[in-house]
């Protein structure tokens, strides 16, 4: 496949990618609701879209366009389920922890970015928050009321789904199917239609996060923020909108309805949806209490091993989690690092390697809807050929330079699964790094047991001895984490 093709969830076909505006590709990805620490499901989504953005930038360098990437932070308005009823998730967490809702949001926002940084996920160009864009959301609601697509009822504002002919076109869900699915649509007496969704909610007594609006004190509905912020920073029509497959309905269908009703223009050209992480075939999630906290995983595995594990499956394929599966990925990750180190340290020889053929195969894989598992498979074909050449006659200067460039460009810059050259040449091998992770997991468990039995002397001694050796322990609500102190 010579040019980039993207699977469009709306048309259910692969389509050639061409930005709307010459010189600029725009992408919006639904960000996290910050009421808890990130888990492996978040990692799959944001690592997958990180590669999407990296590859777009790689292609854009050749085709003359830049990429503007927006990923929001939902810090208000996401209810405890997808219906219009229930308690705001952040407010609920604040009540449980007996702190201010914004303290919850900011604490878990910092935690989210810490985890993404360790996974090598690059920051978006713009990371807007819902609470920082209340005026824009109110303005969008006013436009929808003026155009007859929304109505106020008892301080609430609802989108009239019957006013928008294309409602449900992304998921293919009908209003009747939505009603029969259970839990997705709440039936209220102040709605014209049970399927109408909330744009603005009246704040009940005791609701903490609320703002003044033309309809009284209230707060925005879950779906509103993404439309308002995407259009503010990327325009009425954006190139790519990404998110989890579970967000097709109702979230993305509602985004389409309210955005296109307001502007009269197509909201998104290419819809992309990543699949879920499963545990024994069941979706991972906080509500099912089967999620795996990233901070806990980082205590057992190098974060880049987890990234490598994620990218060995296609973003549209489910990823079944087990520690055994990550350990299996670890050997491949270590081989990648060791081969790169061997290449850099190798003496100049006489052998040649057809690097360009491997580069083209990797390019073709990534141009085929960002097919990372095929790209990684080709990378290991290259590693096999490279090691064979190094075993035989070594590589001449041109082949060695080309091989290093392939590693740097594709394994490093695009896939993000290659440690830096300085780290590899000066640091530990993958095996010794994993040994350190294993030892630290044991020490943190011993310290946890000491604290539980109120043996604070032992707990503090473990912490202090590790600190002397350049390892810092940080106690969080979810347990202790560790990191090496920067020199």
Swiss-Prot record:
It is found in: Cytoplasm. The keyword Protein biosynthesis applies. Belongs to the class-I aminoacyl-tRNA synthetase family. ATP binds at residue 286. A motif ('HIGH' region) lies at residues 32-42. Monomer. A motif ('KMSKS' region) lies at residues 283-287. It comes from Chlorobaculum tepidum (strain ATCC 49652 / DSM 12025 / NBRC 103806 / TLS) (Chlorobium tepidum). One of its GO terms (molecular function) is ATP binding. Binds 1 zinc ion per subunit. It catalyses: tRNA(Cys) + L-cysteine + ATP = L-cysteinyl-tRNA(Cys) + AMP + diphosphate. Keywords: Aminoacyl-tRNA synthetase, ATP-binding, Cytoplasm, Ligase, Metal-binding, Nucleotide-binding, Protein biosynthesis, Zinc. This is Cysteine--tRNA ligase. InterPro entries: Cys-tRNA-ligase, Cys-tRNA-synt_Ia_DALR, Cys-tRNA/MSH_ligase, Rossmann-like_a/b/a_fold, tRNA-synt_1_cat_dom, tRNAsynth_Ia_anticodon-bd. It holds the Pfam family DALR_2. HAMAP family: Cys_tRNA_synth. One of its GO terms (cellular component) is cytosol. One of its GO terms (biological process) is cysteinyl-tRNA aminoacylation. Its EC number is 6.1.1.16. SUPFAM superfamilies: Anticodon-binding domain of a subclass of class I aminoacyl-tRNA synthetases (SSF47323), Nucleotidylyl transferase (SSF52374). The lineage of its organism: Bacteria, Pseudomonadati, Chlorobiota, Chlorobiia, Chlorobiales. Disulfide bonds: none annotated.
């Amino acid at each position: 496949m010579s040019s980039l093709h993207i699977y469009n969830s709306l048309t259910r076909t692969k389509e050639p990618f061409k930005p709307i505006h010459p010189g600029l590709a725009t992408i919006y990805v639904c960000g996290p609701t910050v009421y808890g620490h990130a888990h492996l499901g978040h990692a799959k989504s944001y690592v997958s879209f990180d590669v999407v953005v990296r590859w777009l930038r790689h292609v854009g360098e050749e085709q003359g366009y830049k990429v503007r990437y927006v990923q929001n932070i939902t810090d208000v308005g996401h209810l405890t389920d997808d219906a219009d009823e229930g308690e705001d998730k952040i407010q609920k967490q604040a009540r449980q922890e007996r702190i201010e809702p914004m303290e919850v949001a900011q604490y878990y926002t910092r935690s989210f970015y810490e985890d993404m940084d360790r996974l090598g996920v690059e920051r978006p160009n713009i990371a807007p928050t819902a609470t920082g864009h209340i005026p824009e959301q109110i303005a969008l609601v006013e436009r929808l009321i003026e155009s007859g697509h929304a109505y106020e009822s008892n301080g609430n504002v609802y989108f009239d789904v019957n006013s928008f002919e294309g409602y449900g076109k992304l998921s293919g869900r009908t209003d009747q199917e939505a009603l029969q699915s259970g839990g997705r649509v709440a039936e209220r007496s102040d709605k014209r239609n049970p399927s109408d969704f909330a744009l603005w909610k009246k704040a009940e007594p005791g609701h903490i996060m609320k703002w003044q609006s033309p309809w009284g004190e209230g707060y925005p509905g879950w779906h509103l923020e993404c439309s308002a912020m995407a259009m503010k920073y990327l325009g009425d029509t954006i190139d790519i909108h990404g998110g989890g497959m579970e967000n097709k309905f109702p979230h993305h269908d509602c985004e389409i309805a309210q955005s296109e009703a307001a502007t009269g223009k197509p909201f998104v050209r290419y819809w992309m949806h990543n699949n879920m992480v499963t545990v024994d075939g069941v979706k991972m999630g906080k509500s099912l209490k089967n999620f795996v906290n990233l901070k806990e995983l980082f205590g057992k595995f190098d974060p880049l091993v987890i990234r490598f594990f994620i990218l060995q499956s296609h973003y549209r394929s489910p990823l079944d989690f087990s520690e055994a599966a990550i350990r299996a990925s670890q050997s491949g990750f270590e081989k990648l690092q060791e081969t790169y180190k061997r290449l850099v340290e190798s003496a100049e020889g006489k052998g040649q390697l057809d690097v360009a053929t491997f580069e083209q195969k990797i390019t073709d894989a990534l141009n085929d809807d960002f097919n990372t598992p095929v790209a990684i498979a080709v990378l290991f074909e290259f590693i096999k050929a490279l090691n064979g050449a190094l075993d035989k006659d070594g590589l001449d200067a041109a082949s060695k330079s080309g091989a290093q460039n392939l590693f740097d460009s594709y394994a490093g810059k695009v896939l993000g699964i290659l440690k830096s050259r300085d780290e590899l040449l000066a640091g530990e091998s993958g095996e010794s790094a994993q040994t350190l992770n294993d030892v630290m997991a044991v020490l943190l468990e011993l310290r946890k047991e000491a604290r539980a039995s109120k043996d604070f002397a032992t707990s503090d001694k473990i912490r202090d001895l590790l600190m002397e050796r350049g390892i810092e322990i940080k106690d969080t609500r979810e347990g202790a984490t560790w990191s090496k102190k920067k020199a």
